[in-house]
Amino acid sequence: QPQLVINAVTLKYTISAFNEVLPVLPDDCIISDISSVKTNLKEFYEQSGHPYVSTHPMFGPTFANLGQLSEENAIIISEGDYMGRIFFKDLYARLGLNIYEYTFEEHDKTVAYSLSTPFVSTFVFSAVMKHQDAPGTTFKRHLRIAKGVLNEDDYLLQEILFNPYTSGQVAQI
């Protein structure tokens, strides 16, 4: 019998994937996600009847230096199952990650700031850039970042940009 299920599907399918497996899980099985936006997950978890834990490794394959995880962060949602949080604290500590605990709301506010602001700034840069024969270092680095951001999963970008806290953050740009 499973004690923990980690849902790592694309954000678009997180809740539907849970709905597929919940009927076959024991009642005491902890369900968890690693989604980058937590909108609607708190309500889902509270209605699921299962203990839950929610985390967000604040890095991905596009820009993270997987050889230096000590430079990367992870958020563990402070709401939910105590043992599930302990499991992820231990796992992330073993990986050398910097660990922070936030509520669901604090997490989504942080994501609105730390992801949507750079993403929108990159979209603006991409919209106005033109070919440079002799680009400077800053231009080349930002171009590399822009290519990475624009190659992210479209639904992930949509979820980040439609996070309820994003519009207030982007309005400050």
Set out the residue ranges of the language-model regions:
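A general structural signal for well-ordered alpha-helical segments in protein cores
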Residues: 2, 14, 85, 139-142
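Short, hinge-like loop/turn segments at secondary-structure boundaries
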Residues: 3-6, 48-50, 71-72, 117-120
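Short, basic, helix/turn surface patches
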Residues: 16, 80-87, 125-136
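Short secondary-structure transition/capping segments
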Residues: 4, 65-66, 111-115
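Rossmann-fold dinucleotide-binding core
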Residues: 37-99, 108
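An accessory alpha-helical subdomain
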Residues: 101-173
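Rossmann-fold NAD(P) dinucleotide-binding segment
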Residues: 2-45
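Residue-level "edge-of-site" marker
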Residues: 12, 58, 105
